[in-house]
A protein has these predicted regions:
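Zinc-dependent deaminase catalytic domain
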Residues: 1-152
Length: 152
């Protein structure tokens, strides 16, 4: 079964995630501008589905040793680089990780790699993450924060 980009909103609503339209618009716009067939994006939302932080894969080729910053790390680092009010820090959060194809408009496997998994696990308490949702070709997998160690 192929899940299209258009179905993301419906699938996230099944997870009780109701993001603002402009967040969906941003994701679609970024996917369409992407040069790669595989676009990864991560979103950190508060308990009311307000977007707190956003990150996508970034590729750095201008150095002697080219590297990639995965969307999960980019999103979390973006959170730390902002001036976040204490009441927002105290709120429970959801980390959503999506892999989208810009060419065939479908969801893909976005389960965090081992390094990103460790990075997320090391930041769960500080970020107050209650669950992580990641895409698969069939839809979404939702993992509660106390079960993240089993996600590997």
């Amino acid at each position: 079964m192929i899940i299209g980009i258009d179905n993301i909103k419906h699938l996230l609503q099944l997870e009780n995630i109701y993001m603002a339209e402009n967040v969906y618009d941003r994701i679609v716009r970024d996917v369409e501008c992407c040069n790669s067939d595989k676009f990864h994006v991560s979103l950190l939302l508060d308990q009311d589905s307000n977007l707190i932080s956003y990150g996508h894969n970034e590729y750095f080729f201008g150095t002697k040793y080219p590297f990639t910053c995965h969307s999960e790390v980019n999103c979390i680092n973006s959170y730390y680089s902002k001036k976040i009010k204490q009441y927002v820090k105290d709120r429970k959060k959801v980390l959503i990780i999506l892999r989208l194809s810009s060419k065939i408009k479908k969801l893909g496997q976005s389960k965090p790699c081992k390094k990103c998994h460790n990075f997320i696990e090391n930041n769960i308490d500080n970020l107050n993450i209650k669950k992580i949702i990641y895409s698969t070709p069939e839809g979404f997998v939702s993992v509660k924060s106390n079960k993240v160690s089993e996600m590997e």
